[in-house]
Amino acid sequence: MATIDDVAKAAGVSTSTVSYVLSGKRPISAPTRARVERAIDKLGYRPHAGARALASSRTNVIALMAPLRVGVSVPVIMQFVAGVVTRARDFNHDVLLLTQDDVSGLDRVTGGSMVDALVMMDIEADDPRVPVAAAAKQPTVLIGLPQDPEGLSCVDLDFDAAGRLAVRHLVKAGHTDIALIGSPPEVLRRHTAFAERLMRGLRDQAKISGVTVKVEACDSTPTGASEAVDTLLATAPETTGIIVHNEGALPHVLARLAERGAVVGTDMSVVAVCPTDVALSQRIPMTSIDLPAEDIGKVAVDMVMARLESEQPSETRLLAPVLTERESSADGPAGPLD
Amino acid sequence: MATIDDVAKAAGVSTSTVSYVLSGKRPISAPTRARVERAIDKLGYRPHAGARALASSRTNVIALMAPLRVGVSVPVIMQFVAGVVTRARDFNHDVLLLTQDDVSGLDRVTGGSMVDALVMMDIEADDPRVPVAAAAKQPTVLIGLPQDPEGLSCVDLDFDAAGRLAVRHLVKAGHTDIALIGSPPEVLRRHTAFAERLMRGLRDQAKISGVTVKVEACDSTPTGASEAVDTLLATAPETTGIIVHNEGALPHVLARLAERGAVVGTDMSVVAVCPTDVALSQRIPMTSIDLPAEDIGKVAVDMVMARLESEQPSETRLLAPVLTERESSADGPAGPLD
DNA sequence: TATTAATGTCGAAGCGCTTCGACGAACCGG
DNA sequence: CCGGTTCGTCGAAGCGCTTCGACATTAATA
């Protein structure tokens, strides 16, 4: 491999000049720059990342912690990941992927200065990674909202507002008996932030609107979905509006409803909280509140890069939920409220 | 951040001694080692990855190219990824994730010595990345089989054998009219290796067994699956055995078959080629040939690490397919052949 | 007991890059 | 026409680590 000195020699300049051509941190005359550039691609020179990291204390790598936990939809995780990776490249950064949610990986990459910054997904209310990340010298952005962000920046869909929006939508259409088919029990047991926030929004709005909301946890399997639907139909047969917040279970919930004779979009209104592509690839185009996973990933990178470039106060960005009406919801027994 | 010199000073030894304690490359007496180790965790010392990379020309990072292409099942990709990441950690390596299939990313990370080795997924017959990887100084393992591996190691399920096995299984059960519902047209257009190999195996065995195999490409959408099923039933109504090689379409294929009145496991035998968990999470437990994605990922890492530790000739490892009978297949019109 | 071989530790020379201060040359206004 | 800028370039000092050769010690061998 050619080194910067080889390039300097070939171009007849000093190494620092080559470095400045590369970084643009000092003015270089056009002819010199041209000579250097010619030498660079004649030799096929690539700066050594480690040497660069050592000298500049910048790695141009960010870490992405994307725990592959049971109960969370893998395609949705990947949408976040894709957003992060894509946007990181726009900032000339690469992504180091950590799939275990252990704290050890975290301080390996931060302590060892392997990365310039951190993005962490799937944050729990009381996540052990948060204090560790807060103590690191690298800026961190959380996708999700812990109880105490400890000065870290956060970004997520405003699930609280999403919950309220979903209920309002159903109430406005005349539904008074509403249910949530939610995350798998494991997810709730972990106090995953987004699940709890949606439920809070739901309940708050239900109280305000004076309607009932029955909550049913649901495994992301055909069986789990069937059970959830069955117990719902058994314990709250008057239900006419269902909110589904579980990408994996959604198709099976719809299938079970069909088997049980409930016609979605007529007898039963269903609002999904999920990425748009998931909403559209069901048997019926679903009325849904979009979970803009890829965008959130991109915003996370934007935020973390901003903090890298200049000291900035931490901020929390909650994206406003957008509900799109499609064919899975209709007016309820009380008729449209206008 | 504490440096190795700080540790040396604190322990009253030279820096090289600290280094040798860390690497174990030279014998160090127990008391010295103890003093050094105490100093290390008193200071919270972490070696600087860049400095280490520069001095040792080892980064302890491997690159994983996992292009997120249309038509390939995201959960399946993630199983490969999970296998790679997990196993890499066993070798004390982290994973740099590249999701674009462009060659530029490839030589950024190899040329810049950002990684020690490479694992590339989703290999096409004539993949432009292959020659580039072959020219890199880092060892590379391909998950998939290009036309010309150019001295690189490869690992994959033996799709050729899988195709033959699937046909043999159906023929033995008395089916003579067999069909494949395969990958999406985009995947075939890209000449993705595994899709073509499965089809080759299928056809070879069909010729040998004297049966017909109708091949139907299939989008991984409800519509795509329905269309595939419909045209199959229209153009080859005598079909009694179907092989499905398309994780995304599988549930929709089964749904459509049900709608069309074909009882899977009785009228119609279906063999899936997919990961076991996918086979088990269908409406019926599917007879399937396992695609051991996570294992393949792990093997890829094992192979690449072996080449890293000692110069070894390249090898191609094709995992033997295993068919597990479950409830989606049964004897056909000609009855069991024994 | 003299000789050789481990064993344990140190010092110093890099690894390839960035960056700071310095310096000559060209350029400005007064 | 001269002091003060600005521009373009250079040299050298690190960044924090690994690793090689050297050098004492101590243990094993004859």
Which role fits each region the language model picked out?
Chain A
Residues 226, 235-338:
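Flexible loop/turn connectors
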Residues 67-75, 100-103, 155-165, 181-228, ...:
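Hinge/beta->alpha junction and helix N-cap segments in small-molecule ligand-binding domains
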Residues 17-20, 57-70, 177-187:
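Short beta-strand segments enriched in small/hydrophobic residues
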Residues 1-60, 333-338:
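N-terminal helix-turn-helix DNA-binding module of bacterial transcription factors
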Residues 2, 61-168, 234:
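Alpha-helical recognition/docking segments in bacterial nutrient-uptake
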Residues 43, 173-175, 232-238:
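Glycine-rich phosphate-binding loop signature in dinucleotide/nucleotide-binding domains
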Residues 14, 60, 116, 176-177, ...:
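Short acidic/polar active-site loop segments enriched in Thr and Asp
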